[in-house]
């Protein structure tokens, strides 16, 4: 409609009046735009829910293991890290390691394996394991085979079976910030595994944040 009006208005200008009716011209353009916009598919607005998330202390007598893998690209220079805390939120042990060049899922599994080995060496019998990698949590909670991740996946499952009481839980990344910081620390060095006797500086403030049960908000699609 708008193009037709412009064409006829041009012809009128050239062959008849020689003047431009700018007011009608502009109204027609506006009407054409409105008419066109009616036909466009409307984007449904996704409602967001605000939830409060934070690291939770395990029940009395239990220990919590948080692990994470870090690979900025897929694949890329990667690292893994994790830490153990008791029912009071007291730091027990933590580790970081370089993994060379690998993808994010394998980095997550390497970090989990190292965390489970550390928990086993320390003799913990009741363990809650938290990761922010949902795909790894699903793998650990069933027996689905994945040839691309063998034998690392089998190692993790076998180590998990040696712990009498355990739970593997998915958490949001905001809950897993200590492990994330350790994984990034590990990615800065190649093939070095370090167990810390004291928390490194980059996690001290996060440990305090978690211990006093501070939460932050996260937006979720409803």
What are these regions (language model features)?
Residues 1-222:
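Primary recognition of RNase H-like, Mg2+-dependent phosphodiesterase/nuclease domains
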């Amino acid at each position: 409609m708008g193009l037709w009006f412009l064409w006829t208005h041009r012809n009128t200008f050239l062959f008849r009046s020689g003047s431009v009716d700018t007011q009608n011209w502009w109204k027609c353009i506006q009407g054409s735009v409105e008419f066109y916009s009616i036909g466009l598919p409307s984007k449904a607005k996704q409602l967001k829910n605000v939830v409060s998330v934070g690291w939770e202390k395990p029940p009395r007598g239990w220990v919590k293991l948080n692990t994470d893998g870090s690979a900025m690209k897929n694949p890329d220079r990667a690292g893994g890290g994790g830490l153990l805390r008791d029912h009071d939120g007291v730091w027990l042990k933590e580790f970081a390691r370089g993994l060379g060049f690998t993808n994010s899922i394998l980095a997550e599994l390497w970090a989990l394996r190292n965390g489970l080995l550390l928990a086993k060496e320390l003799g913990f019998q009741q363990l809650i394991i938290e990761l922010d990698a949902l795909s790894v949590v699903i793998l650990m909670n069933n027996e689905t085979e994945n040839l691309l991740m063998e034998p690392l996946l089998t190692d993790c499952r076998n180590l998990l079976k040696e712990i009498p009481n355990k739970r593997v839980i998915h958490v949001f990344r905001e809950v897993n910030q200590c492990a994330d910081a350790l994984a990034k620390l590990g990615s800065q060095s190649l093939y070095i595994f370090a167990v810390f006797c004291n928390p490194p500086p980059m996690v001290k403030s996060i440990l305090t944040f978690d211990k006093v049960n501070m939460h932050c908000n996260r937006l979720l699609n409803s």
